[in-house]
Amino acid sequence: MNSDKADNANSKEQDLNRATSQPQPELTDNLGHRINSDQNSLRAGARGPSLLDDFHLREKIHHFDHERIPERVVHARGTGAHGVFELYESLADYTIANVLTDTSLKTPVFVRFSTVAGSRGSADTARDVRGFAVKLYTQEGNWDLVGNNIPVFFIQDAIKFPDLIHAAKPEPHKEIPQAATAHDTFWDFISLTPESMHMIMWVMSDRSLPRSFSMMEGFGVHSFRLINAQGKAHFVKFHWKPAAGIHSLVWDEAQKIAGKDPDFHRRDLWEAIEKGNYPEWDFGVQLIAEGEETKFDFDVLDATKLWPEELIPVRRVGKLTLNRNPDNYFAETEQVAFMTTNVVPGIDFSDDPLLQGRNFSYLDTQLSRLGSPNWPELPINRPIATVSNNQREGHMRHTINPGQVSYYPNSLGGNQPGEVSAQAGGYVSYPEQVIGPKVRVRSESFGDHYGQAKLFWNSMSGPEKEHIVKALQFELSKVETRHIRQHMLEHLGQINDKLMSQVAIALGEITPPAPKPTNGAIKQTPPSGKAMPDGTADAADEKALLVSAVSSTTASGGIQMSSALSMAGGPKDSIKGRKVAVLAADGVASEQVDALKQALMAAGATAEVVGTHLGSLTGANGSPVTVDKTFANSSSVLYDAIFVPGGVQSITALMKQGDPHEFVDEAFKHAKTIGASGEGVDLLAACQIGQLLGLKTIPTQTQAVEGVLTGSATDIQKVVQSFIKAMAQHRHWERAVVEQVSA
C-alpha cells in the first residue's frame, strides 16, 4: 500500500506510465525485429504474387483483423478523463473507508461518461440517460461508483433488465432506430411496466439532453450502506453536484448537433481539459440510519424512487476534478471495466434487487468483452493497492507468480498470502440478519409507481413542463401501434391530466381546441384548458397552461414540490466552459472583437470568430482578425451564444448572405443569448427576430430584450459585460415570440 499521501494523487498516472510506449526512431514488428520496408509486401518479382514467407505482412494484417473487441451491451458510446478526488469533510462517524475519512488524501480517479442505448458510433446528443461511472484508485483497492445522471431507474428488479434493453435497442427485424427510444418496442415495454413512470418523466425532460458532461449531476442510483468503526450502518445515496450548474440543450438543437458534430460532448470535455477549464463536481451523501428507513412512505431499496432532499439533505463532503485527458482512447476509455462490486471496507450493499443483479452482471460482462478473467491486470483497471492472491493462468496473463504454492491454506509457502483481519483492513461484509422464505414476489412497499412521477412533474418550471410534453408528443408520434399510444396516455393521466391531454391532442386522440386568430392570425389563442400543440419551438400558450398543472403526490414523504429537481433554480453565476460565435467579415471592428475575447477568456469562456473563409480577416482599422470557423463548417447549435460586432463593411457583407441570418434566428429560437454592438445591430434588425422584437436602429445605450443585448460601439465594455451576465442565465425561456421564428 502506498503510504505517501503527497504522491497519492499521481500514483495512478505513474502506474500507467509503466505501460506507456513512446514512439521510437526505428520501426519494428511486435517482436522487436527492425523493419526494412513497410510499404510493399514481399513478391515473386515486381508484378508477381505475394509470398507466404512475408512474416511482416502476415503479422500486420493479422493484428489489424483482430483489433476490434465487442462493444459494451449498454453504455457503448462513451468518453473518459483522469482526475482527482479530494475529501474536505470526514465521514468517520459513518464509515471506516479511508477514502471517505482521511481529508489529507488526494485519490486518483478515472471517469467514463456515456449514453446507454446507442452503439459505439452513435451521436453524443441522443435523448438518453448518461452514464457517470467513477473509478477511484484508493489505497484500500478500487472503489467503483457506477452511476447515471438520473437518480432513479426504469425497473425495480434486475431480472427485467434484459427485457428493458431489448425493447430500447434497435428493433431486431430491421435494426432501426439507432440510439433512439421513439419506436414501438420501447414504448410497448414501458406502457406495460408502470414502475418506469418516474424514470420516464426524467428521460422525457431536459435532463436527458445535457449541454455538457460538466453540466450534469451524477447519482449512485442505489442505496448502499456505510459501516463505521462500531459496526453501525447507515443507508447512503451518493451524489455528484456540478460546479458549473445543471444545464441542457433543447431537442431541436440536440438533433441538429447530432448531424453537425456527433462528437459534441466528448469534444467539449477534451477541449475544456486541454484549455485548463477543469470540470468539477461536489461529492455529497444522503444518509439514513439503519432502523429509521421504515418511517418514510417510500422504500429506500426501490431504485425507482429518490430520497427528497427536503427530507434527507445532501451533505457535500468532497470534490471531483477532471484534469487530464487519456493518452489512448482504446487502452483507457474502451478497456476500463467498472463493477458495482468494487467497494472498500466501510462500504457495503443494500438489498436493492436491481443492485443485486448488477453485482453479478458487471463481473460477467467483462469476460465476453475483454476476453479473459485477467482483465483486472489491464493498466487502466489495475489498482494502486498491492495485489496478492492465488488466482493463476488464463488468457493473456501478465503477472509472473514465482513459487511452489497457489492455494490457501498452505505450509510450503508460509501460509501466505494469508487472510487479513478486520482490524488490519480486511473486508468484512455487514452482518445483516436475513430471514424469510424463498419467494418470487415484489414487496408491497415498492407498489407506488406514480407518486414520485407527480413530484418530478410538479417541481418543473413552465418551460421544463413544456419540454416534457413536447418530448412525449415527439416520441409517441413515432409509435405506429395505436393501442400502445393509448395505453401510455392512460399512464400519463395518472400523473397529470393536463400533461395527458396536451400529448393526446398532438396524437389525435383528443379534439384540438378551436383556433382564435389574433393579430393577423400569426398566433392562435385557444380556449382555456387546452392549448394548440406547436412545432419544435416552445408554445407560449402551452407553457402558460402547464405552469399551474400540479398533482397531489404520494411516496414522497409529504413533499409536493422539490426545488432540487428543477434546473431552473440552479446557480447561474458562471459562463465557464461556454463557447461564443462571433460573426464577422472583412471590415469588422476588430477592437470590439478583442474586447469581447478578453472578457470571455477572463470568465473562462471561449470566443470563436465565424467568417466566410478560414485564415484571417482584415479589420476596419487594418489589423488582422483570425478566423476559427466558417459558416460552412459550423452552426449556431454548436455555440452557447452569438455576438455580432460592428463594422460597416463587415455587416454589409454578412447581410447579403443567408447563413448569418440563420445563425441569429436559430440561436434565438433555441433561447440563447444574442449580442450586437454598433452596426452589428443592423444585422439583427434584418433577421426575423429584428422584426419580432422591433429592433431598428443602434441604441444610444445598452438595451436588453428577452436575452438580446444591443449597444453602441462606444459603449462596448458595458455591452460585453451585459452580454456575459445574460449568458450566465444559460437560456432565455421567457421569449414569447420564439414559436414564430422559422429556423
Task: Give the positions of each predicted feature.
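Short amphipathic alpha-helix with an adjacent loop that forms part of the alpha/beta core around
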Residues: T630-L638
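Active-site-adjacent core segments of small-molecule enzymes
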Residues: M1-S590, D594-K597, M601-A602, T606, ...
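C-terminal (or distal) subdomains of carbohydrate-active enzymes
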Residues: S590, E662-E666, C687, G694-K696, ...
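Catalytic nucleophile loop
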Residues: T481, G611, A641-G647, P660-C687
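Short glycine-rich, flexible loops that bind phosphorylated cofactors or substrates
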Residues: S650-T652
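A charged, well-structured terminal subsegment
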Residues: P699-A743
